[in-house]
Amino acid sequence: MRGEAVQAQQISLTKYLWFPINREGWPFVGLFALGALLLGQIWGPLGWAGALLTCWCAWFFRDPDRVTPTRDGLVISPADGVVQMVGMVAPPPELDMGDAPRMRISVFMSVFSVHINRCPVDGTIVKCSYRPGKFLDASLDKASADNERMSVRMSRADGREIAFVQIAGLVARRIKCDLKDGQQVRAGQRFGLIRFGSRVDVYLPDGVAPLVSLGQSIIAGETVLADLDSTEGARQGEIR
């Protein structure tokens, strides 16, 4: 048992002290590193400050592996962050999913979150739609309608549909989505990122209750947002 505990501790330390960097981040890391070298030629302390910023940039674009639950019917969080809003809202009109409200879970990502986004369920991408817009604070409810966004509609093998939306914010002004119409994806699969903090909304099928609460910290590719096959009602929670 002691040996297993030591091994688990070593794995945990490795996870936090070493992390892969997403390929989207390498150009930024390179620019920060070059800037640090140039600043160091001007004045040593400036070079050290640039080196710290380079390390921060590398950490920002970290892309750790995740252990994704594989049971059918689970809806997995597409983003790291905090549950900002939970409620009934109609999906974006560009997805052609009708005007009827669906349960929406909004996950806010700060500049300290991992910004790699992941698919919430297994299925087929039905439609991807980019919409330019404003860059309001992503924590505002109206950001879902007014801000730049990438909306994705997907269908499971049983025909039930889920939508998720990448929303730009005050700082985040670059949404990247690698998905294409007709593409087959798996839950937990990486599909894109939003640079420097923002929000991802998930729209559940009719009659499905959320299994997360407002203010809850969640992890992309690991935290279960909902269970499509469960009859459990919406979970309640409070900050303690």
Swiss-Prot record:
Record's keyword terms, sorted: Cell membrane, Decarboxylase, Lipid biosynthesis, Lipid metabolism, Lyase, Membrane, Phospholipid biosynthesis, Phospholipid metabolism, Pyruvate, Zymogen
Localization (cell): Cell membrane
Gene Ontology BP annotations: phosphatidylethanolamine biosynthetic process
Keyword Ribonucleoprotein appears in the UniProt entry: no
Top-level taxon of the source organism: Bacteria
Membrane topology: Peripheral membrane protein
Its EC number(s): 4.1.1.65
Record PTM text: Is synthesized initially as an inactive proenzyme. Formation of the active enzyme involves a self-maturation process in which the active site pyruvoyl group is generated from an internal serine residue via an autocatalytic post-translational modification. Two non-identical subunits are generated from the proenzyme in this reaction, and the pyruvate is formed at the N-terminus of the alpha chain, which is derived from the carboxyl end of the proenzyme.
Molecular function GO terms recorded: phosphatidylserine decarboxylase activity
InterPro entries to which the protein is assigned, alphabetical: PS_Dcarbxylase, PSD-A
Any one Pfam family match given in the protein's UniProt record, by short name: PS_Dcarbxylase
Pathway note: Phospholipid metabolism; phosphatidylethanolamine biosynthesis; phosphatidylethanolamine from CDP-diacylglycerol: step 2/2
GO CC term (a single one): plasma membrane
Cofactors named for this entry: pyruvate
Protein name: Phosphatidylserine decarboxylase proenzyme
Species for this entry: Paramagnetospirillum magneticum (strain ATCC 700264 / AMB-1) (Magnetospirillum magneticum)
Gene: psd
